[in-house]
């Protein structure tokens, strides 16, 4: 299960990195007035970055689990007769399974939140300055 979760986390980080780069390259320079679309684009960019950072921390927590498990197993091999080390490994595995289930739910939430933000504000992300008519009606920005 952790292998597939790790692959999903890696996919999310890669997808968000591409989106972050795309938004950054499409961001015009700030000028006086008519920067509403740019501010929307900046808000979306900060959400993308936050989602990417969350995914990276999830990946690091999975790596920490493997390190902790290996450390306990090494102690278990040195002290073969102590049952508490076996229980510790089992407890660590159960804890990680619960965390992995939560990670999957968190990944889903990150994808949904970012998709919602992007779909609702796509015209501002794609063309933040827009045409003169679009600049006059900026009341349809969704948070």
Residue positions per predicted region:
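Long, contiguous alpha-helical bundle segments
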Residues: 1-143
């Amino acid at each position: 299960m952790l292998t597939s979760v790790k692959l999903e986390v890696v996919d999310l980080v890669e997808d968000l990195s591409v989106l972050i780069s795309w938004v950054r390259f499409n961001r015009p320079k700030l000028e006086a007035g008519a920067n509403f679309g740019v501010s929307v684009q900046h808000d979306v960019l900060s959400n993308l970055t936050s989602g990417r950072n969350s995914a990276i921390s999830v990946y690091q927590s999975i790596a920490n689990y493997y390190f902790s498990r290996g450390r306990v197993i090494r102690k278990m091999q040195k002290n073969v007769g102590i049952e508490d080390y076996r229980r510790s490994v089992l407890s660590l595995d159960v804890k990680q399974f619960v965390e992995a289930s939560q990670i999957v739910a968190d990944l889903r939430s990150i994808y949904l939140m970012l998709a919602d933000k992007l779909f609702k504000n796509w015209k501002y992300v794609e063309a933040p300055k827009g045409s003169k008519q679009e600049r006059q009606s900026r009341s349809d920005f969704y948070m």
